From Swiss-Prot:
Key enzyme in the regulation of glycerol uptake and metabolism. Catalyzes the phosphorylation of glycerol to yield sn-glycerol 3-phosphate. It comes from Thermococcus gammatolerans (strain DSM 15229 / JCM 11827 / EJ3). Pfam families: FGGY_C (PF02782), FGGY_N (PF00370). ATP binds at residues 12-14, 261, 303, 307, 402. Sn-glycerol 3-phosphate binds at residues 12, 82-83, 132, 239. It is an enzyme of class 2 (transferase). The keyword Phosphoprotein does not apply. This is Glycerol kinase. It catalyses: glycerol + ATP = sn-glycerol 3-phosphate + ADP + H(+). Transmembrane segments: none annotated. Glycerol binds at residues 82-83, 132, 239-240. GO terms for biological process: glycerol catabolic process; glycerol metabolic process; glycerol-3-phosphate metabolic process. GO terms for cellular component: cytosol.
Length: 493
């Protein structure tokens, strides 16, 4: 009987289930969207039941499309939107809506904590204190949901990020992995345990926290009434860490960039915890008794800038048009676009920066804006990778996400980085990473070496730009960024 691995890829707006065979081919896929809820300005929530319903329907659809029986699934891996915070009872029933990573309701609370404890928190967790991470969201829930803290003190409340909630629903086991725990701002990434001092600062009772396990081990088995089979759930990693694993980024210095609405860049730093003033330090995964660390840079707006060309100023009808427009020009002709719609992320961390288009003349047309937008994505990526290179040597960039289909962008990325850019055959690297972690735990795949042999290159983009052109273009970009920074303060918005 042929066996397969099922990957659950739970994102911010949809839940997917993807079935892979031993050669990493996709043989079945199900995907269902679920809504976000906005009870107040700046607040973002999910209904955990809607997440579960979408995820379970996706599993059923993937099995049907693959014509695979549940008994043929050798293992299940889970990957998820990180930081999103859920509290539920011991029956798995949610006690409030999930507070999503994007939610800013705790921003003021975190600013107060940051002033007093910022350096200590970064030293323990690798994270710059922010409302983005789980700790303040969980504190808000305990402080504001009537009766929740009392129930928590009695042992009637469980906390988890989305992976924990899904695994609990599937197996009844209350667990998470190192990569997801490292995004809560409650986990000591050196000691590899929940940190008592941080729990005290945020007022979190330790009894509600999940057990932290490796990213590849059997956490439990699916309840038979769910799928008609007891399947091991044996892989777990946050979405960006799973993408690095799916790119076979196992060696120190290996880097992946995921180009989505925003972009996330992770560099494997091996067994060493490395700190950067302008990047986050995180755990990539735990495997075979060892933890691998990573540096992470998040870029707030990349693909969203292309969406703005389409939906905002309507100079294109579909994203793919940008490549054709950009290649009509020999150069950017001095036009730069800094897409700081919501400020700038790594390495600038300027929440007051705003979008800027500069260098416009009477001859500027939509092709200039299209090219400037694609180039901006590449410049922003170089900004992050330059920070990473201060701490770890980088030879190439492995890429995934929708924008990697744009050959102009990928070539310009290679040119401006002066590093080769590698696009793999399988684009679903996040789901694939979770599948690999699950499969390794049950010997479906035997080793990292076997996984490396499965990772196939679709296209390599070699740098072809001369050094002087590269220097001039990047200098222009840095000058444009300077002019965009702090603009919201200047105009008082």
């Amino acid at each position: 009987m042929e066996r397969y691995v099922l990957s659950l890829d739970e994102g911010t707006t949809s839940a997917r289930a993807i079935i892979f065979d031993r050669e990493s081919n996709i043989i079945g896929l199900g995907q269902y969207e679920f809504p976000q809820h906005y009870p107040k300005p700046g607040w973002v929530e999910h209904n955990p039941e809607e997440i579960w319903d979408a995820q379970f329907r996706a599993i059923k659809t993937a099995l049907e499309r693959a014509k695979v029986e549940p008994s043929q699934i050798a293992a299940i891996g889970v990957t998820n939107q990180r930081e999103t915070t859920i509290v539920f009872d011991r029956d798995g029933k949610p006690l409030y809506n999930a507070i999503v990573w994007q939610c800013r309701r705790t921003a003021e609370m975190v600013e107060e904590i940051k002033r007093e404890y910022g350096d200590m928190i970064k030293g323990k967790t690798g994270l710059v204190p922010d409302a983005y991470f789980s700790a303040s969201k969980l504190k808000w829930l305990l402080d504001n949901v009537p009766g929740l803290r009392e129930k928590a003190e009695k042992g009637e409340v469980l906390f988890g990020t989305v992976d924990t909630f899904l695994i609990y629903r599937l197996t009844g086991e209350h667990v998470t992995d190192y990569s997801n725990a490292s995004r809560t701002m409650l986990f000591n990434i050196k000691r590899l345990d929940w940190d008592d001092e941080l729990l005290e600062i945020f007022g979190i009772p330790e009894g509600i926290l999940p057990e932290v396990r490796e990213s590849s081990e059997v956490y439990g088995y699916t309840k038979k009434e769910l799928l008609g089979a007891e399947i091991p759930v044996s892989g777990d990693a946050g979405d960006q860490q799973a993408a690095l694993f799916g790119q076979a980024g196992f060696e120190t210095g290996m880097v992946k960039a995921t180009y989505g609405t925003g972009s996330f860049i992770l560099a494997n730093t091996g067994k060493t915890v490395r700190y950067s003033d302008n990047l986050l330090t995180t755990i990539a995964w735990g495997l075979n008794g060892k933890v691998t660390y990573a540096l992470e840079g998040s870029i707030f707006v990349t693909g969203a800038a292309v969406q703005w060309l389409r939906d905002g100023i309507k100079i294109i009808k579909k994203a793919s048009e940008t490549e054709e427009l950009a290649t009509k020009l020999e150069s950017n002709e001095g036009v730069y676009f800094v897409p700081a719609f919501v400020g700038l992320g790594a390495p600038y961390w300027d929440q007051f920066a705003r979008g800027l288009i500069i260098g416009i003349t009477r001859g500027t047309g939509r092709e200039h804006l299209a090219r400037a937008t694609l180039e901006a994505i590449a410049y922003l990526t170089r900004d992050v990778i330059e920070e990473m290179e201060k701490l770890v040597g980088i030879k190439e960039l492995r890429v995934d996400g929708g924008a990697t289909a744009n050959d102009f962008l990928m070539q310009f990325q290679a040119d401006i980085l002066n590093r080769r850019v590698v696009r793999p055959v399988v684009k679903e690297t996040t789901a694939l990473g979770a599948a690999y972690l699950a499969g390794l735990a049950v010997d479906y795949w035997e080793s990292l070496e076997e996984i490396e042999s499965l990772w196939k290159v679709e296209k390599v983009f070699e740098p072809g730009m001369d050094e002087e052109t590269r220097r001039k273009l990047y200098h222009g970009w840095k000058e444009a960024v300077k002019r965009a920074m702090g603009w919201a303060k200047v105009v008082g918005i």
